Amino acid sequence: MSIHDITSPLPGTFYLTESPSSPPFVEVGSTIAAGDTIGLVEVMKMFNPVTSEVAGKVVEICVASEDPVDVGDVLIKVEEG
């Protein structure tokens, strides 16, 4: 199995949840499908969904919610399969 990095498509602030009281989109161990939302990047008060390009299991979350991110920063790592 290979590990796939899901990276930030935009510079901004990364969020693992839709709102402060919502559960996270993903956690370590979560099974995801291609196209699933894994988080949001806020840019100028606009929230942009970040989706997975692959199906698999989340093995690492590389940034915390509300961390600043730049284009290409690794957000999560997914074991494909």
For each of these PLM feature ranges, what is it?
Residues 8, 44-48, 69:
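Flexible, active-site-adjacent loop/turn segments at secondary-structure boundaries
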Residues 29-38, 43, 66-75:
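A structural signal for short beta-strand/turn segments enriched in small hydrophobics and glycine
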Residues 3, 60, 64-65:
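Generic detector of contiguous secondary-structure segments
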Residues 1-40, 55, 81:
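Acidic, low-complexity mobile loops and tails
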Residues 9, 53, 63, 69:
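Short, acidic, Ser/Thr-enriched surface-loop or helix-capping motifs
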Residues 19, 43, 49-52, 63, ...:
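Short, conserved catalytic or interaction motifs in soluble domains
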